[in-house]
């Protein structure tokens, strides 16, 4: 997130798994000042990320918060200088890419399940955990661990 992420821009950012903001970023959901409410999951994602009280404050005041405030309340995962934004994102992506794509996919399903009404996140986790066994990634990961080397997931 670089610069302003207001309304739909913040709603789009909140739909991402991980958010990184430059220190010049300003974020907010000003829709109530226009006579509507945040849409596209904005109210739901915001409250899941920052908690009910902070979400209500942000929506009701239609104000903006700084990158530092967004980091403190959990709206963004990390902050950095504007000139370091791309490099910071690339470093995070590189760390993710070193891991098992199959396991990451299963982890996303399990984590997201905990936020869906009527879905038992623990059951989804148990199912996804079980699916990981016997995969090529599991074999590579455990073999690499036993051989004291880094796994090579391709």
Feature locations, PLM:
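CoA-thioester-processing core
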Residues: 6-59, 73, 88-92
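C-terminal long alpha-helix characteristic of the crotonase
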Residues: 20-25, 67, 76-124, 130, ...
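Hydrophobic alpha-helical segments typical of transmembrane helices
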Residues: 42-45, 54, 66, 103-106, ...
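Acidic, divalent-metal-coordinating active-site segment for phosphoryl/phosphodiester hydrolysis
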Residues: 62-69
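Terminal low-complexity tails and localization/encapsulation signals of metabolic enzymes
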Residues: 143-154
């Amino acid at each position: 997130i670089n610069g302003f992420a207001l309304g739909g821009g913040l709603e789009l950012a909140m739909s991402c798994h991980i958010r990184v903001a430059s220190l010049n970023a300003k974020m907010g959901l000003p829709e109530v000042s226009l006579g509507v409410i945040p849409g596209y999951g904005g109210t739901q994602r915001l409250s899941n990320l920052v908690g009910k009280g902070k979400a209500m404050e942000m929506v009701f005041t239609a104000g903006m918060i700084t990158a530092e405030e967004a980091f403190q309340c959990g709206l963004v995962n990390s902050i950095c200088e504007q000139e370091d934004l791309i490099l910071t994102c690339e470093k995070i992506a590189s760390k993710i890419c070193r891991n098992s794509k199959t396991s990451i996919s299963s982890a996303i399903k399990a984590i997201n399940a905990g936020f869906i009404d009527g879905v038992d996140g623990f059951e989804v986790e148990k199912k996804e955990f079980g699916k990981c066994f016997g995969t090529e990634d599991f074999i590579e990961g455990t073999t690499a661990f036993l051989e004291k080397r880094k796994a090579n997931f391709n």
